[in-house]
Amino acid sequence: MAQTLSFNGRRRVRKFFGKIPEVAEMPNLIEVQKASYDQFLMVEEPAGGRPDEGLQAVFKSVFPIKDFSGASMLEFVSYEFEPPKFDVEECRQRDLTYAAPLKVTLRLIVFDIDEDTGAKSIKDIKEQNVYMGDMPLMTDNGTFIVNGTERVIVSQMHRSPGVFFDHDKGKSHSSGKLLFAARVIPYRGSWLDIEFDAKDIVHARIDRRRKIPVTSLLMALGMDGEEILSTFYTQSLYQRDGDGWRVPFQPDALKGQKAIAEMIDADTGEVVVEAGKKLTPRLLRQLQEKGLKALKSTDDELYGNYLAEDVVNYETGEIYLEAGDEIDEKTLPVILSAGFDEIPVLDIDHINVGAYIRNTLAADKNENRQDALFDIYRVMRPGEPPTMDSAEAMFNALFFDAERYDLSAVGRVKMNMRLDLDVPDTVRTLRKEDILAVVKMLVELRDGKGEIDDIDNLGNRRVRSVGELMENQYRLGLLRMERAIKERMSSIEIDTVMPQDLINAKPAAAAVREFFGSSQLSRFMDQVNPLSEITHKRRLSALGPGGLTRERAGFEVRDVHPTHYGRICPIETPEGPNIGLINSLATFARVNKYGFIESPYRKIVDGNVTSDVVYLSAMEDAKYHVAQANSVLNDDGSFAEEFVVCRHAGEVMLAPRDNINLMDVSPKQLVSVAAALIPFLENDDANRALMGSNMQRQAVPLLRAEAPFVGTGMESVVARDSGAAIAARRGGVVDQVDATRIVIRATEDLDPSKSGVDIYRLQKFQRSNQNTCVNQRPLVTVGDLVNKGDIIADGPSTDLGDLALGRNALVAFMPWNGYNYEDSILLSERIVRDDVFTSIHIEEFEVMARDTKLGPEEITRDIPNVSEEALKNLDEAGIVYIGAEVQPGDILVGKITPKGESPMTPEEKLLRAIFGEKASDVRDTSMRMPPGTFGTIVEVRVFNRHGVEKDERAMAIEREEIERLAKDRDDEQAILDRNVYARLIDMLRGHVAVAGPKGFKKGTELSNAVISEYPRSQWWMFAVEDEKAQGEIEALRAQYDESKSRLEQRFMDKVEKVQRGDEMPPGVMKMVKVFVAVKRKIQPGDKMAGRHGNKGVVSRIVPIEDMPFLEDGTHVDVVLNPLGVPSRMNVGQILETHLGWACAGMGKKIGAMLDAYHESGDIKPLRTTIDDVIGSGPKGEPIKQYDDESIVRLAEQTRRGVSIATPVFDGAVEADVNEMLEKAGLKVTGQSTLYDGRTGDAFDRQVTVGYIYMLKLNHLVDDKIHARSIGPYSLVTQQPLGGKAQFGGQRFGEMEVWALEAYGAAYTLQEMLTVKSDDVAGRTKVYEAIVRGDDTFEAGIPESFNVLVKEMRSLGLSVELENSKVDDLGTTAQLPDAAE
């Protein structure tokens, strides 16, 4: 077969061990954030045609605003965004917020009101665009830039609006009786609780206030007692029949009961059922078939029933008995004497139907609607006298007013589902029918029908993403604004104003600022590496406003629930107080329009699994039988086994294959991104997998990233979606490449309005939020063809477009002199020497020159009393050079501050006059390197206030920036020219010219030779005979001119921004930021980990020659403790070790063949081996079809080790590992003989050796080590501060004091508690004594003792210290008191 395919070497090729084909594509990993915010802003939608959601819905809900008299109205028309003033990069550098100005079109309508009739007519309409503050925009990577730092808004999980039924689990009452309750939770508005008490009376509560009988609530809705009873109960009619009663025969009500007395047919008088017999469904059916219509009943059987209607004398209007009254010996004669021979009775048997509502009605003191409304009013507004109008208005506002009460679409959908209603989701308030349905359902629950709700089911919890959180916040801002607008409309002459004059946008802007700046859900982005960024954006938090609190959250909320499957990861959650409250979205999960998390499934049609994918939420999939993704299938897609393991209604079961409706899409759909990156996850204990997923997020980007030999296939997805690696926006040819940018000439998706050139700026040594280094490196060379979506540059922690958090290290599992006790890690010096685990960290230092009362501070090189040596790294402006190597105490920016004038003696004045000595007026406040930090200056930024003269350094930085912009413009212009003139020459060629440049002969046919005689700029002068061609040329000229001017305009705008002064905090004249790159080699005390939760601290770095070595002389890099595996049950690391060993062995084999090919030129053996080991390329294409050059490239890539992918729950098994080891020519045991580096002797037993992917975590000893001699003290207690950040001391705590007491070290202890801590006078004396060379000193009273005395005095206790002196005999003599 012809080798047609080529491989460019820019992608990592992995051998794939997965057996299950991927049917569904994984959604973009940061879609959650982007989709939600796009839906909120709707920037792309036309201003007039936006649907009512997001920002549009907020404006619609607050506007129109009417003034108090109704004489004028302010209407909302539409809104639009202007382009942002600064782009993302400029905002990062200048500490600004990336936002776009929001302009809202408002219409002010003024009415004329006829004083007699009150009729309104429009007098005046004014429309105007009003600026409503800036709205932060989301960057392409799903983050926000607020004051120059990247932030992420975490999505919140909260209880969905709707109705919930629950019981108290028998906790409220000593008998353990279950008290049922229903709660209607709106999106905003009052909560309604309906609950039973221990006496089975039903009560209602509004907003957790005092309870009222539920019948009062129903009366307030306009029902009377009879209507309430007829709504909740059916009726039977008892008809007088001689001395007994005739009752309709109701088989359904009698099912399962015992006949108390004989049952007699009312028509025939025969006994149909004996007393004491059980009424089975079969018996009742037989009676019905025999034609039994009615039974005969006695008065005794009528007693205890309740009347269904009032017993009224219609002539006189006298009410004998009311509906709901009990029939007994006293009341029955009253009914009969009044001449009633038919009595309607409520069907209450106290077994299937309880008398709860009837009893509540009987216990309710309120008789009618007015009483009920007044009662509710008193509960809601205690102390205010109710009137009918105010009570009615308040009751309506509670649940029936769309302004105050909003169920939201979600709430309505949930209510419909739970109560079997069919109401459109536009009805957002409660209805009378809803409340009745809730009470009915609650009573049925009490009667033993139906199930209560599970609050932790994901069908009852929903996600509020950025857009929705922002919408709620903006609504609050607008409501604050609304009050101000109403007041202003009433107080101002409305005829003369424009909408602009009524609006003060500050409250709205402040609400937005407050949300992004200080909301609990707005977090500083975790930017240690690309994985931590992605995970942060996919996080779901149950905390935050309107959510839970750590203290109140119980075990159930935190636990894994069956509905989490495929929606929320059961593994990834923090250890500690937040466990289970902060979760991560599963890989394939997405959030639907109602905020419920959906998971994808494959449809099964006629027993065959199809590739059709449906997304279902937890409410929807409970009714299906769902098979697992790894169920065995036949070739036609049917199930191979008769019974299939499946999930149904939260249980795992075996079901016949015909019952299965759906199947999982992928085995990794149940875990999160971080957990899906752990190979052999299925072989690890869940607790260790949790640590593994959490620790991958803390891996520091290394100097040289290296993708893992043993991956899972998720690595490239994470690198692409996180935005760390740069993907081409459209196809084209690489025109220029250097370390800072890539220029690509586009060849597809060419749009005349867009530039034909894509310039990608690479980030070089930028600081991330966690001080790690963000650095991008190009992967393409000039002339490369690039397709859309190809990776063209690697970022931090990526390697050929794969996530690369650590390095592959050769590991041996064995003890080594006790240096791997308690999970310690022993490293070889080679790792330090070759910079294997070296990382770069970037620290930012900032200094401001302010305008003080005594005069302005100055940034300068001229600093008093500082040697020239200390200034060696500063330029003439007093700012450090880029590239200077600095150490603790070095000056980075020289700064002097004026100090207060101290009175001068006449002699000093004379000297000052003679020598002009000025230096004593200022003090040195330069910024110096903090202790323990060494590094190299990589960047300096200087910011000046508007109108402040720029120094030489600022000018130089500005010139450099403008040159960079000019180079971009010139390159783009050059490519544009080349393309346009190439098209022009094609258009002109072969045509007869009727005009041309000077000296051109008319009528000549144009050829390449003729045209190229003239300079390019003169080609436009040619005019051709053919009108159509001439028209095309003129169109091209117009397009070219437009592109050129657009390019120039863009350049001018950017230059203007660079030259403009910066916005500074008040009082700041100038600010300098210095970035220092610190190289951190690995050293003892650093924390390292594998991907399986196997973490440890480096205990020692051993010379290479002392490390154990293999038979071929290779020394191992890392020695781990074998005891760390069995008890922790993370066997995945051992399988990874073996597979990594096979990969490296295979790589060696391929390397040897590659060398042989370079010598002999025969590529066949190399091709066969690579095809056998890897099989297919990055897009699944067979390697057989690669050309020779591609095979060599691939061999070069796999030389260090073959990369493989073993997806979670569908990866390599033991047999695969053995096969790989055999192919690589290694022992199947995975063990090798090791030799001791110190003696050269072989160890007694064989040792497991292989490659593990090790990570260096962001817990570096350099950041933690800390020492203090003198430093700051706390103001009140005068004790040293604590912590490295405050340059504090070590705490000598209670237990340490016990230790010194136990040793009897009295003087040491006294020092610790006094002079070394808070005895102010004592510490000064100690210092003086040491200076004198004397070592005697006396401890005084600790300051904290004085604080205690003062605190006791503040409690009104008189505490005095008595001065007394011990005389020679040991008795105390009273001293005279010290002078007060």
From Swiss-Prot:
Pfam family, one: RNA_pol_Rpb2_45
One GO BP: DNA-templated transcription
Gene3D superfamilies: 2.40.50.100, 2.40.50.150, 3.90.1100.10, DNA-directed RNA polymerase, beta subunit, external 1 domain (2.30.150.10), DNA-directed RNA polymerase, subunit 2, domain 6 (2.40.270.10), RNA polymerase alpha subunit dimerisation domain (3.90.1800.10), RNA polymerase Rpb2, domain 2 (3.90.1110.10)
UniProt keyword Transferase present: yes
InterPro entries: DNA-dir_RNA_pol_bsu_ext_1_sf, DNA-dir_RNA_pol_bsu_external_1, DNA-dir_RNA_pol_su2, DNA-dir_RNAP_su2_dom, DNA-dir_RNAP_su2_hyb_sf, RNA_pol_bsu_bac, RNA_pol_bsu_CS, RNA_pol_bsu_protrusion
EC number(s) given by UniProt: 2.7.7.6
Enzyme class: transferase
Gene Ontology MF terms in the entry: DNA binding; DNA-directed RNA polymerase activity; ribonucleoside binding
A single Gene Ontology CC term: DNA-directed RNA polymerase complex
Subunit annotation: The RNAP catalytic core consists of 2 alpha, 1 beta, 1 beta' and 1 omega subunit. When a sigma factor is associated with the core the holoenzyme is formed, which can initiate transcription.
Descriptive protein name: DNA-directed RNA polymerase subunit beta
Classification lineage: Bacteria, Pseudomonadati, Pseudomonadota, Alphaproteobacteria, Hyphomicrobiales
Gene symbol of the encoding locus: rpoB
